[in-house]
Amino acid sequence: MKEKVIDFGNEKVSILFKKLFFPTLLGMLSMSAVTTIDGIFVGHGVGSDGIAAVNICVPLLMSLMGAGLMMGAGCSVIASIYLSKGKTVLARATITQAMLFVTLISVTVGGFILAFPEETARMLGSSEHLLPLVVDYLVWFSPSLLFELWIAVALFAMRLDGAPKLAMWCSIIAAAVNVVLDWLFIFPLGWGVMGAAFATSLSCLAGAAVAMGYLLFYARDTRLHSLRPGRKKILFFFHDIGMQCKIGSSALLGELTMAILLFIGNQVFMRHLGDDGVGAFGVSCYYLPFVFMIGNAIAQSAQPIISYNFGTGSTERVRSALRVSVFAALVCGVISTAAFILFPELLVGLFLRIDNTAARIAIEGFPYYGTGFIFFILNLSIIGYYQSMEQVKPAITFAVLRGLVFLVPCFMALPAIMGVKGIWLALPLSEILTTLVIVVTFWIYSRQRAIICR
């Protein structure tokens, strides 16, 4: 299971990025495919009500995935710097602590959902009509939370250990298992949204088994090991977890941005267009994680290169990694935007019959919605750059701008001004405004450096 050692300190940055990016991208897209496959089968097996029900659950699930990405990004940055200084034991301890922490989070939240499913569904904004479907999905999906968070952290550690291809296969295996089980549970067995949720839980278990097997028995530098109890060890644990949360918080905010988008979007669409509007928005939101994962794959591929060379003081290699990641973000953003503008019928048709009311609403909105994807992916790559260098303040600032400061007002104001079209344009405008702030920040910083160097 071992792969060739990756030399983060000497190999050409563009070649390093390619080695990491393509396996990471395929793996991340496979992770998104797990939920999207649910949507395709639910859309054709249950209908737009099923998609709306799953979409109501997604903000909570994204928030928890954000916690996993936060811990994965945070522990990976710290472990990268430890490894650049030859401190392998501390790197392993950091990753083990992250795994333990996400285990506690997932068990706590999963237990709450199982104890109070209807209350959780209503808290997420479910209508009485959709409540039985939402409860079914929540109850049967909650066991997967543990495995999803394990995978989220493990993939960071595996890429850092020089095993990006195996990390990719963990996600692909989970997606493949999900396809088979979704078909079996929804169509032959007729289990509906419950079947989709149960299929996701089992598929995540399969992916987590591969990832944890690697970290327990095969990893070179990021292998899990036992943590000794004791007062000082416990204090060190909480201190280290705090640092990981601080460094990775922008990754959490990235997922929370999507969770906020879904939560507020569900409410706004429900108010303007009812359950059909939520179903239409739900189709678009099945694609949003793919766009997010593209940006995330760029940031995660650049992260070990940036963090390692930042730890060794190789400034030019850090800048080179930034240039490569920005170029990749622009290319991927243009392709994503073009797909939504040119092929809305094809994209919507994967989930719903084109003559469906929800489908018609989605087809009209997709071209507006897709205009923001260039800026969406670019913003994620820049936030990842700052996060990789432990520059928490700008990373969090940009993440908060796109997730709260700009997005929420856009959702409130644009529908009042432009009607339904304004709901679709809320995300693009929020991302464009964030990009403008980032560009101005870079310009000011460049001028300050030029003045200092004179």
Where are the regions that the model predicts?
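Short runs within selected transmembrane alpha-helices of multi-pass transporters and secretion channels
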Residues: G72, F141-R159, A167-N178, A196-M212, ...
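Alpha-helical transmembrane segments of multi-pass membrane transport proteins
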Residues: I15, S30-M31, G68-L69, V109, ...
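Transmembrane helical elements of multi-pass membrane transporters/channels
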Residues: K19-D38, W140, A174, S203-G207, ...
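Structural signal for membrane-spanning alpha-helices in multi-pass inner-membrane proteins
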Residues: I113, F156, D182, I186, ...
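Short alpha-helical transmembrane segments in multi-pass integral membrane proteins
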Residues: M1-T24, A79-L146, G190-S249, I306-G372, ...
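Interfacial helix-capping/hinge residues at the ends of transmembrane alpha-helices
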Residues: G39, S76-V77, E118, L155, ...
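Helix-terminus/linker motif at the lipid-water interface of multi-pass membrane proteins
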Residues: A33-I51, A121-E128, L184-W191, L252, ...
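Small-residue-rich hydrophobic transmembrane alpha-helices
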Residues: I51-G111, E148-A167, A280-L342, F376-A395
